[in-house]
Amino acid sequence: MSRHHSRFERDYRVGWDRREWSVNGTHGTTSICSVTSGAGGGTASSLSVRPGLLPLPVVPSRLPTPATAPAPCTTGSSEAITSLVASSASAVTTKAPGISKGDSQSQGLATSIRWGQTPINQSTPWDTDEPPSKQMRESDNPGTGPWVTTVAAGNQPTLIAHSYGVAQPPTFSPAVNVQAPVIGVTPSLPPHVGPQLPLMPGHYSLPQPPSQPLSSVVVNMPAQALYASPQPLAVSTLPGVGQVARPGPTAVGNGHMAGPLLPPPPPAQPSATLPSGAPATNGPPTTDSAHGLQMLRTIGVGKYEFTDPGHPREMLKELNQQRRAKAFTDLKIVVEGREFEVHQNVLASCSLYFKDLIQRSVQDSGQGGREKLELVLSNLQADVLELLLEFVYTGSLVIDSANAKTLLEAASKFQFHTFCKVCVSFLEKQLTASNCLGVLAMAEAMQCSELYHMAKAFALQIFPEVAAQEEILSISKDDFIAYVSNDSLNTKAEELVYETVIKWIKKDPATRTQYAAELLAVVRLPFIHPSYLLNVVDNEELIKSSEACRDLVNEAKRYHMLPHARQEMQTPRTRPRLSAGVAEVIVLVGGRQMVGMTQRSLVAVTCWNPQNNKWYPLASLPFYDREFFSVVSAGDNIYLSGGMESGVTLADVWCYMSLLDNWNLVSRMTVPRCRHNSLVYDGKIYTLGGLGVAGNVDHVERYDTITNQWEAVAPLPKAVHSAAATVCGGKIYVFGGVNEAGRAAGVLQSYVPQTNTWSFIESPMIDNKYAPAVTLNGFVFILGGAYARATTIYDPEKGNIKAGPNMNHSRQFCSAVVLDGKIYATGGIVSSEGPALGNMEAYEPTTNTWTLLPHMPCPVFRHGCVVIKKYIQSG
């Protein structure tokens, strides 16, 4: 049993008696030199590290032979090693305190020098009372090489083992009796240095003993610079010595190992000497093994998990070697007369096509996988299959522009999904304006959906650049039509699309002129500016020579000249392209703004795009100081009717044409009114009730946007103004309002357009005024008004009314719309004294909650609010 290893420091005040340590660790008296193998001789197995200790791997360096006087050695055999003795001429043997009886301290071991090793789980060396040979047993790891170094450590408690390099070989004045040609010397700390900054042990390899024995070798250890953080050192010029990285003070373990256990360092050659000025460095253990960086981590008490990331690579390498040697293969593929022998499991794991094919072949043959299968493929090139198999067995392959298409075609056909992604990723990086349409056609032909959508989106996004290339003039008619007719074609002006169509026809007029009308039909002619339409399109010879083309141009002219009839002219050509800035937007029209206690009217018209959360200005109102008007959208146009200006009730109707961004007068209403409601049913605009010249009016009329005519319909049963009106389930509903007495009218009135009849019910639950109404998911929502924050929900099927969630703000004279399945309440005023609200809030039916949204351009109330599709020019 080995002796107890104590951590306390011990002073050996006298040297040890010289004694001989045999290879097996027993004591002898015939020699004062320890025995090792000099050049290929036997090794001392007793130098193995004790259990629980991490050996200290050292890369040998070469020291010049110091100029010291030779002294005779007690043994002349090849087992002699270099002995380090004190420079003192006399050797005095004294008894050191704490040394057991019979053990004397060698005169070659200086005072305060102790044997040291480094445990695997500590960052400082622990000390032992035993010399190196007493730390071994004969049964400890027999046959182990003598490369484990004995470290002589001073008794300073602040020494920490690390590795670093120095420019010149250090020296030390104390003498140590060492066990191996490689020694490690730990310098002592200066007295003024604190223990928090550790120093490094420098490791050096002594040359083999010369033919004439030396009496002593003296190495002086100079003062060493302190360090605070790991720093890489320069690579030594010596062969076999690599770069050394100095570990930080928080390094775990002995600071010498960063990877797998290293083999013993090669012994130094006798003839090798350290060049003058060459730094001596320690090479760190390498991790570039066949298996890469291996990892061993603790997963429990007494349990460790070993991970070798390089294992799959090595397995593939071995399988590939077997494939090339046709060893253990069980599948033969014959393509174009060439035979390829592979492993069924390997190929089936990468290709769903071959997996299914192998399964069916095994079932049909009834071999049960016991005999080698043979598959003959006639729809594949042998070179392509060879490349695919190379990828399957190695995981790497060189792809270039020459083979990318054929590889992708084969990988897609045989369902090599991983390789398909590689090819798609390669081709994605190769997409340009000059080849994207060709890649698009190729992806469509081979049914590679991922590449198809990628190339399509790329080509649509850079249409102006693609239109300038020659490739677009060479694609087929069907591909050309599919490309330019797409709603997502990114173009700032439809004129560019028209010019591209004309260029494609003129590329080969003999065969393409017959498609002129078909191609012109995909151009959004109504979005071409009227002046360009009259001056350029009308004068094109291709257009003049085709009656069908002239009809398309005339349709665009009518669209510009008859804005009120656009509702009946809805075709694919009148639909704006989405990528050109067309979106469903919320438009705020006019209204009132409160500045202190003073109100003023607004003529500004703005729209909010929820896709990018931006506000855009539109054409301002063509009048000033008008209020209590009603606003409704029909198609993509906005109709503003009635109102009061300078105390005069008006019957004017203005139409905002979204395409041209301007306001135009249309036919007037037959009855002037303000504070009325307007809505759209079956393409016609209805104006309901309101406040006329002589008080409340029950008059109802509707406007035909095609004929630009108004006609009267059945009047309201109860004349009201400032009511809430909407369309739901084929009926028109009017909720509450203000009656002729100036009080809230608790009445619900409904109108059936097909029969031109009204009905009404009175209910105390309906007493709203100054509140809007909208329809969402078959329910009618009445927002704010006299109830401020309240939301009232009416179910037309059941005929009941219930309370909904309150809004975040009290809102009178607000407006509301429905967009993308949500209700948006905009602006309003808290009370008659103000303040006006400059924000919006949205109702989410799935959560039944209201959410505040970013602010509007300014606080506003008594304004109009509608939703249209707006063509917004970028920039």
UniProtKB/Swiss-Prot annotation:
<feature type="compositionally biased region" description="Basic and acidic residues">
    <location>
        <begin position="131"/>
        <end position="140"/>
    </location>
</feature>
<keyword id="KW-0677">Repeat</keyword>
<dbReference type="Pfam" id="PF00651">
    <property type="entry name" value="BTB"/>
</dbReference>
<dbReference type="Pfam" id="PF07707">
    <property type="entry name" value="BACK"/>
</dbReference>
<protein>
    <recommendedName>
        <fullName>Kelch-like protein 29</fullName>
    </recommendedName>
</protein>
<dbReference type="GO" id="GO:0043161">
    <property type="term" value="P:proteasome-mediated ubiquitin-dependent protein catabolic process"/>
</dbReference>
<dbReference type="GO" id="GO:0005737">
    <property type="term" value="C:cytoplasm"/>
</dbReference>
<feature type="repeat" description="Kelch 2">
    <location>
        <begin position="637"/>
        <end position="683"/>
    </location>
</feature>
<dbReference type="InterPro" id="IPR015915">
    <property type="entry name" value="Kelch-typ_b-propeller"/>
</dbReference>
<dbReference type="InterPro" id="IPR011705">
    <property type="entry name" value="BACK"/>
</dbReference>
<feature type="compositionally biased region" description="Polar residues">
    <location>
        <begin position="115"/>
        <end position="126"/>
    </location>
</feature>
<dbReference type="InterPro" id="IPR000210">
    <property type="entry name" value="BTB/POZ_dom"/>
</dbReference>
<feature type="repeat" description="Kelch 1">
    <location>
        <begin position="585"/>
        <end position="635"/>
    </location>
</feature>
<dbReference type="GO" id="GO:1990756">
    <property type="term" value="F:ubiquitin-like ligase-substrate adaptor activity"/>
</dbReference>
<dbReference type="Pfam" id="PF01344">
    <property type="entry name" value="Kelch_1"/>
</dbReference>
<feature type="domain" description="BTB">
    <location>
        <begin position="329"/>
        <end position="401"/>
    </location>
</feature>
<dbReference type="InterPro" id="IPR011333">
    <property type="entry name" value="SKP1/BTB/POZ_sf"/>
</dbReference>
<dbReference type="GO" id="GO:0031463">
    <property type="term" value="C:Cul3-RING ubiquitin ligase complex"/>
</dbReference>
<dbReference type="Pfam" id="PF24681">
    <property type="entry name" value="Kelch_KLHDC2_KLHL20_DRC7"/>
</dbReference>
<feature type="repeat" description="Kelch 3">
    <location>
        <begin position="684"/>
        <end position="730"/>
    </location>
</feature>
<feature type="repeat" description="Kelch 6">
    <location>
        <begin position="822"/>
        <end position="870"/>
    </location>
</feature>
<feature type="repeat" description="Kelch 5">
    <location>
        <begin position="779"/>
        <end position="821"/>
    </location>
</feature>
<feature type="region of interest" description="Disordered">
    <location>
        <begin position="248"/>
        <end position="291"/>
    </location>
</feature>
<keyword id="KW-0880">Kelch repeat</keyword>
<feature type="region of interest" description="Disordered">
    <location>
        <begin position="115"/>
        <end position="145"/>
    </location>
</feature>
<dbReference type="InterPro" id="IPR006652">
    <property type="entry name" value="Kelch_1"/>
</dbReference>
<feature type="repeat" description="Kelch 4">
    <location>
        <begin position="732"/>
        <end position="778"/>
    </location>
</feature>
